[in-house]
Amino acid sequence: MHVFYFMKITLDLLRAHVGKVINESRSPAGNWLQLTLAAVEKGKASISVLVRKEMCNPFGHIHGGMMSLVIDEAIGWAIISLEAESHYTSLNLNVDFLYAAPEGETITAVANIVRQGKKIVHAEVHVYDSKQTLLAKAASNLIVTGMKIINS
């Protein structure tokens, strides 16, 4: 088991994992993505993901649901960077798909917490390919659940 399972994650701990593949987090779906934490600061996170065959639609491009998963994971890491005391859950996720990414492409999702209220957080994400083409943009509102984050 990895430390991400057992403790409240601090910004310093996140920074120590920049450039590394995250495959032992609390998120089984995120672990499956084999994402790399590309950058992190308070309220912002970037993740990179290699588009694998099992992520693709019949045309050989990333499936919209997979793109949404990448976006949701990026938001999750940006939320974690806030060092909140409680978990958040999504109220909505609105995605504009602009261009497709083929199998073998590495995509980068850049998440930014635009507003953090007492109960609601608003996040925005842009997803780029290796040529910096904007592939998708998204916005999400999340609500604090009241479930406390384990702190050991």
What are these regions (language model features)?
Residues H2-S152:
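Terminal targeting signals and extreme-terminal segments of soluble enzymes
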